[in-house]
Swiss-Prot record:
GO biological process, one term: formation of primary germ layer
Protein name stated in the entry: Transcription factor Sox-3-B
General function of this protein: Transcription factor with sequence-specific DNA binding activity. Binds to the consensus sequence 5'-[AT][AT]CAA[AT]G-3', showing a preference for 5'-AACAAT-3' and 5'-AACAAAG-3'. Inhibits beta-catenin-mediated dorsal axis specification by binding to sites within the promoter of the beta-catenin-regulated gene nodal5. Acts maternally as a transcriptional repressor of nodal5 and nodal6 to restrict their expression to the vegetal hemisphere of early embryos and thus establish germ layer formation.
Gly residues bias (residue ranges): 21-30
The protein's assembly and partners: Interacts with ctnnb1.
Cross-referenced Pfam families: HMG_box, SOXp
Keyword tags: Cytoplasm, Developmental protein, DNA-binding, Gastrulation, Nucleus, Repressor, Transcription, Transcription regulation
Organism: Xenopus laevis
The record's note on its domains: The 9aaTAD motif is a transactivation domain present in a large number of yeast and animal transcription factors.
Gene3D superfamilies on file: High mobility group box domain
DNA-binding region as annotated in the record: 40-108
Gene: sox3-b
PROSITE patterns for this protein: HMG_BOX_2 (PS50118)
Length: 307
């Protein structure tokens, strides 16, 4: 065992002396023309000194074993050795390092760096050249990500994508004014179709506002208009036309009802002769109000002559 260890220790020393050009060799350090000395190798460490003979022996025993598998097994065997067994190889590695520093004082370790430009180019390319030759792969990937999640951008009915497409068309230099007008008419916000629930709710709010603004005598007409509008909004909501103008007869009737209601709650004014006529007008207005607002059940139940 010790004889094999001595031969393993002597062989790297002789090789290092041959490479560095020892003091007895005529080649010396000045011989730099050979291709072996163009690149200076690092000095061997303790594991490399020990694994030289072990690697050769294991390769002879297992000729089909790969070099990486041999290195794994040698590393596991090196860890199992004790410090006393590693000591001679550590001392030999220190001696080789001292000789290397003496022969090459200006030596600096420069590891070989792999170029990563090809990896960056292949990172953004699709398999099979699916993209067109004039399309940037990075911009195409960003557009695909935006189109993949249209429901998370907060825009309903695809309005965000429509706006982006309209902006893209607007920036095109070869587009004339007629095409731009067609695009603007196509993406007009007034022509967008809303859902039936939204349109019916909007019609209900508009009808409620018109109900409060009109007199109670015309509630039936407004409810009919509201129902017809809600039925029409289920099919398609069109731009609503302005409401018809109130005629003079309707305005006069509303003003008359308003005067009757005000005069009923105000104290009687003027002389005593006007009191009876004012009271009769009050009774007539109250009777007419209940007759128009109530149903047929209210008209014949409570007589108003006892007031």
């Amino acid at each position: 065992m010790y004889s094999m260890l001595d031969t393993d220790m002597k062989s790297p020393v002789q090789q290092s002396n041959a490479l560095s050009g020892g003091p007895g060799t005529p080649g010396g350090k000045g011989n730099t023309s050979t291709p072996d000395q163009d690149r200076v190798k690092r000095p061997m460490n303790a594991f490399m000194v020990w694994s030289r003979g072990q690697r050769r022996k294991m390769a002879q025993e297992n000729p089909k074993m790969h070099n990486s598998e041999i290195s794994k097994r040698l590393g596991a065997d090196w860890k199992l050795l004790s410090d006393s067994e590693k000591r001679p190889f550590i001392d030999e590695a220190k001696r080789l390092r001292a000789v290397h520093m003496k022969d090459y004082p200006d030596y600096k370790y420069r590891p070989r760096r792999k170029t990563k430009t090809l990896l960056k180019k292949d990172k953004y390319s699709l398999p099979g050249n699916l993209l067109a030759p004039g399309i940037n792969p990075v911009s195409g990937g960003v557009g695909q990500r935006i189109d993949t999640y249209p429901h998370m951008n907060g825009w309903t009915n695809g309005a965000y994508s429509l706006m982006q497409e309209q902006l893209g068309y607007g920036q095109h230099p070869a587009m004339n004014s007629s095409q731009m007008q067609q695009i603007q008419h196509r993406y007009d916000m007034g022509g967008l179709q809303y859902s039936p629930m939204m349109s019916s709710a909007q019609t209900y709010m508009n009808a409620a506002a018109s109900t409060y603004s009109m007199s109670p005598a015309y509630n039936q007409q407004s409810s009919t208009v509201m129902s017809l509008a809600s039925m029409g909004s289920v099919v398609k909501s069109e731009p609503s036309s302005p409401p018809p103008a109130i005629t003079s007869h309707t305005q006069r009737a509303c003003l008359g009802d308003l005067r009757d209601m005000i005069s009923m709650y105000l104290p009687p004014g003027g002389d005593a002769g006007d009191h009876s006529s004012l009271q009769n007008s009050r009774l007539h207005s109250v009777h007419q109000h209940y007759q128009s607002a109530g149903g047929p059940g209210v008209n014949g139940t409570v007589p108003l002559t006892h007031i």
